[in-house]
Amino acid sequence: MLKTQEIYSSEDEDDMCCPLCMEEIDISDKNFKPCQCGYRVCRFCWHHIKEDLNGRCPACRRLYTEENVQWRPVTAEEWKMDLHRKNERKKREKERKEVELSNRKHLANIRVVQKNLAYVNGLSPKVANEENINVLKGPEYFGQYGKIIKIAINKKAAANSANGHVGVYITYQRKEDAARAIAAIDGSVSDGRHLRASYGTTKYCTSYLRNQQCPNPSCMYLHEPGDEVDSYTKEDLASLQHTRPLSTKPNVVNGATHSPSPSLPFKTPLLPVTKTPLEEANSSPAAQNQHITTVDHVHPQVSMTPSLSTNNTATSVPAPYSSAASVNVVPGHATTILHHEESSALPPTAAWAKLSPSVLQERLRAAVNQQPLDALKSSSTQTSIPKIQKLKAAKLPSEEENTTKWLNKAINDLVSSLSKINFSTEGTEFDKKQIEMIQNLPPLFVFNARSVIDKEVVPEQEKSAENQPPTSLGINNGNPVMPPPGFQS
């Protein structure tokens, strides 16, 4: 049992190295213990310490003596086990290298977007050549955007170009400098030629693909795995060149650089989408105090006309109550209407116009809903009963209904009644029939309904005084009538 335990079979101990020379301890040294503390070193280091140094154990500082050395010869079984372990280790190492090599084989066809590499195409061969490399690095050209590590001319593109355009790869020290250069150069004109700039792509180094050390210290190819989202195949790049440019152009807004997602194969705009003037007006604090109405068409046509006129081909947009006009919107045109609070244009004496619409509506309802007098039953006033019933049946505007539309309807009724009267400049007086028609017209503003009813249904004994003129302004047949607004009685 003791012999089995002493057999050196631990995999961790197989990889044990000498703590002094850091060399792998051979199988013949694994059973060698030069000190009683158990601190193991190879026999070469033990002999060097004993002969050339102080001869003490590096761990416990005891003197190395021949009597304290513990050593056991290696058996044939241990040799076989050690040989089998070495073969297995070599086999695993070979498989690991093959897996890495197979994983890197497909990388030979991959191109990775390099964020510090700018590719400029469209330069003149007189400028972009091997003799002017130092000039291109200077502040007059690409050096003004940042420190340049290397400039390489794409000779293959120059040879295949029919227009003689040359492409140049500029490797900057910082990614921000490359983004600034691309944003400034792309779309510019140099020597009558339009320049195009974008991020450049690079490939993996052949030594890296073979899992070898690269012998070129200034190699500009990749020696480590690139970002997957920035990787493209040759077929992808070829198809994108025939459709739309690769999204390798940065977005620079207000000095900040935003790199577009390489997974999107299309360019993104350099500048942010600006708001339209109408959107800016809506977002501004001043626009919160205005009511904006828009109709999506082409040309604006706004006509400010009095609210008394109507048109079947126009849509009336009522103005606020403080305004004395409405807006007619003609269909087929775009209209942007800003309703501002306007001061009244009426004289100060017209205090009735300053009343709110609700007060006017309440007065009109009270005037219409009043019951007629007993004199309405008289046979001589039967002709006025339909007029009073018509006045009662008149539809008054509700609280939500627009007062302007109701006034338009009332004036239209007056105009239709006046159309029966013939006006002439030859005569100086109206005939009796025309005077009766004028007197039977209802008033435009009713503030004293009782006086109107008394005027319409006067008693029969006072009918004889109908044609007599009133004695004073505001007095008719002895019954008080409120004078028109803005006048003194």
From Swiss-Prot:
Residues 76-109 form a coiled coil. A zinc finger (RING-type) spans 18-61. InterPro entries: Mot2 (IPR039780), NOT4_mRING-HC-C4C4 (IPR039515), Nucleotide-bd_a/b_plait_sf (IPR012677), RBD_domain_sf (IPR035979), RRM_dom (IPR000504), RRM_dom_euk (IPR003954), Znf_CCCH (IPR000571), Znf_RING (IPR001841). Residues 246-261, 466-479 have a biased composition (Polar residues). A zinc finger (C3H1-type) spans 199-226. SUPFAM superfamilies: RING/U-box, RNA-binding domain, RBD. Residues 116-198 form the RRM domain. One of its GO terms (molecular function) is ubiquitin protein ligase activity. It is found in: Nucleus. Keywords: Coiled coil, Metal-binding, Nucleus, Repressor, RNA-binding, Transcription, Transcription regulation, Zinc, Zinc-finger. The keyword Secreted does not apply. One of its GO terms (cellular component) is cytosol. GO terms for biological process: negative regulation of nuclear mRNA surveillance of meiosis-specific transcripts; nuclear-transcribed mRNA poly(A) tail shortening; protein ubiquitination; regulatory ncRNA-mediated gene silencing. It comes from the Eukaryota. Residues 246-268, 458-489 are annotated as: Disordered. May negatively regulate the basal and activated transcription of many genes. This is Putative general negative regulator of transcription C16C9.04c. It comes from Schizosaccharomyces pombe (strain 972 / ATCC 24843).
